[in-house]
Amino acid sequence: MGLLDIFKRKDKDRVPKEVEASEKTDSAANMVKEIREEILQKTAIPCMKLELTDTKPSLFDSKVGGIGYVPHDAKIPEDSKGVQLRLLAQIDCAEITLEDFPHQGLLQFWILNDDVSGLNFDDNTLQDTFRVLYFKEPDRTVTEKEVCEKVQDSSSDEEEDYFPVRGCYGLAFSEDVDTISYSDYRFESCIRKLVQQDYPEEAENLLENMDDFFDGGSGHKIGGYPGFAQWDPRSSEDTHDVLLFQLDSDMGTDWKILWGDCGIGNFFINWEKLKNCDFSDVLYTWDCC
């Protein structure tokens, strides 16, 4: 047997091992693909995707930032110390087509303009430094000038920098379908149950990097699944099971929205309370990298 024959034999011996490794890789990839597709199908729910526009919204339009509707006989929302909150966003509910959400009136999100954007680390459902308000039939005789006269001119330039919204923007709505994000607290249990059920022998290996194959839930939206820069503050015991509103950091030619170091803001509500248009119990959170 010559030297060439020895090399040929070694190549033949090596090929089956390489093929076997390749087949294992392909098999694992196929399993991940199958699991991903099944989970996407099982978790798909409708949502409204939102985009900022450069239009000038009126007092009654959907908007991010700017001046929000306030009834004739009402004050701008304040915290327990008498400090006014600022309008984070206003939604014209006639633009929402999702089931169980209100389809008329105005839904507003107000937060305190401080260094934590109104976040309460001890109780993120206490509507003191943030407020969620719903006006089923807003009074169309209210004017923007009238509301502006109620605003306290007490914000310094330093305080102004804390507010996540830079300016005022309109909102464009589009119907979409959202699938579970790896940020959602239900993601791991959902994945684990399916993998252990269908692929018990490969479960641990498959679960290790499964979140790499799913979306993080970012973007502006109503309904759907949330995104977080760090983690979901909810747990399986939490009753705030619906994403009421999410506002992400957004950079155009310049930063339009910035939560801390490029974070995301979220508002959650219980499904039954949403159906009853009861916005007294809402969980507000935001986080950043």
How should each PLM-predicted stretch be described?
Residues 3-289:
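Preference for intrinsically disordered or flexible, low-complexity segments
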